[in-house]
Curated annotation (Swiss-Prot):
Induction trigger: Up-regulated in the root by dehydration, salt stress, osmotic stress, high temperature and abscisic acid.
Subcellular location: Protein storage vacuole; Golgi apparatus, Golgi stack; Golgi apparatus, trans-Golgi network; Prevacuolar compartment
UniProt comment concerning the protein's domains: The BURP domain located at the C-terminus has not been identified in non-plant proteins.
GO biological process terms, semicolon-separated: seed development
The protein's name in its UniProt record: BURP domain protein USPL1
Signal sequence, renumbered to the chain: 1-24
Keyword annotations from UniProtKB, A to Z: Golgi apparatus, Signal, Vacuole
Expression tissues: Expressed in cotyledons, radicle, floral buds, open flowers, roots and developing seeds, but not in leaves. Highly expressed in the root tips. Detected in young leaves, hypocotyls, stems and mature seed funiculum.
Length: 280
């Protein structure tokens, strides 16, 4: 049984995980921690501007109003290419810590210096890292553990609502997952007096969600955006992190927004495979 499970995970790793990692993975840009200071971002620049479309998800609090136009990239992973969500029983059979990296790479038949090996190391590093001041964070490795940890963080006796980003087009059109100019066609609606957790799907051989929130430091909005040609609409959550004073000074958001590090709120949209939990 154990060998069959190991082989099935390895097969999924080679076929699904490999395809996923080589594509742009937006969630990794939304995490406000890094393993070391001074990360080189020169590979993201072209002629002094950012050349990675997945970075076009950040905006400022002043942008959050009716009529504002922003260049945004909403990326959708092909669900058939996403690694599977394990049960708790399956996930508990596999260690999930950076200290077991060599074992895990061998378990999944992945080399350390491959894109997949580097992605595994990065995900484990983020999940093992201590929370920054005022932050609560965890990684869910199964549906059961994800729900349990969300309830533990937000309260066992509260009603929870799940929010995701949705892209909609008329039936005769296909969705274009590319950079588009989007305009706020309705005034963003703030969800007042709620708790929130943002859960970002991370690159790993099976589904892992990195969830984090900031105590009293985030504002959540429901937004309604439309492309210039009016053919594509996006509805979903946006969050503004009001206190960035403890963020890494090299966080890519400060560079994308061309702001002084830790000086002002940072807002962002969510990729389509991310989850936002809020109290009702």
């Amino acid at each position: 049984m154990a060998s069959t499970f190991r082989l099935s995970i390895s097969f999924l790793t080679l076929i699904l995980f490999s395809l996923w990692v080589v594509e742009a993975h937006t969630s990794r840009k939304l995490i406000s921690i890094k393993e070391k200071e001074g990360q080189d971002i020169s590979h993201l620049l072209k002629d002094g501007e950012f050349d990675d479309p997945s970075l076009y998800m950040y905006f400022t609090l002043n942008d959050l109003k009716l009529g504002t136009k922003l260049l945004i990239y909403f990326y959708k992973n092909d669900l058939q290419k996403l690694p599977p969500l394990l049960t708790r029983q399956q996930a508990d059979l596999i260690p999930f810590t950076k200290s077991k990296l060599d074992f895990l790479l061998d378990h999944f038949s992945i080399t350390k210096d491959s894109p997949q090996g580097k992605a595994i190391k990065e995900t484990l590093g983020h999940c093992d890292a201590k929370a920054i001041e005022g932050e609560h964070k965890f990684c869910g490795t199964s549906l059961e553990s994800l729900i349990d940890l969300v309830k533990k963080t937000m309260g066992y006796n509260v009603d929870l609502k799940v929010m995701t980003t949705k892209v909609m087009v008329p039936a005769q059109n296909s969705i274009s997952y590319a950079l588009h100019n989007y305009t706020f066609v309705e005034a963003p609606k703030e969800l007042v007096g709620i708790k929130m957790l943002g859960c970002h799907r991370m690159p790993y051989p099976y589904a892992v969600y990195y969830c984090h929130g900031h105590k009293g430091g985030s504002r959540v909005f429901e937004v309604n955006l439309v492309t210039d040609d009016g053919r594509q609409r996006v509805v979903g959550p946006a969050v503004c992190h009001m206190d960035t004073s403890t963020w890494d000074a090299d966080h890519v958001a400060f560079k994308v927004l061309k702001m002084e590090p830790r000086s002002a709120p940072v807002c962002h949209f969510f990729p389509l495979d991310n989850i936002v939990w809020v109290t009702k």
